[in-house]
């Protein structure tokens, strides 16, 4: 495409954006009137509670006299500081991937026997569907690895013989297969 045509397109896109802005802006006072949070933030910048979970927590600030004060960030999985998990893995010279996956799924650290069985199960589920790596990852490159991971996860739906079954056993199978396959997908991505 020649430069003049590209410039014309840019100008047309800008004009369309202005038209869009003129007819799609919600006045800020409406958010206050209807108590709607923008971007999952309160007016003071603190996060909005969007749900309850036992899986993880992120601590990044304190509230003192209605003022948000930054604090050392702490990420916990199932009540365990992630820094402690990492330190334990370093100290014992282990990877920790399977152990953390178990912790996130089942709410407690696995016994040695549970971890061995879980690792074997993950190993048996690591293989990607035939031609998946070539067709979905290698032939469709992306500069953004998160985009590549997202696309790959969505594409796996097409290879699942029972993708919409809502029961726990099926959801567990899907979760285990995703956990097992993501490291393989990342290496191709």
Residue positions per predicted region:
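Hydrophobic alpha-helical bundle cores within soluble ligand-binding/oligomerization subdomains
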Residues: 2-189
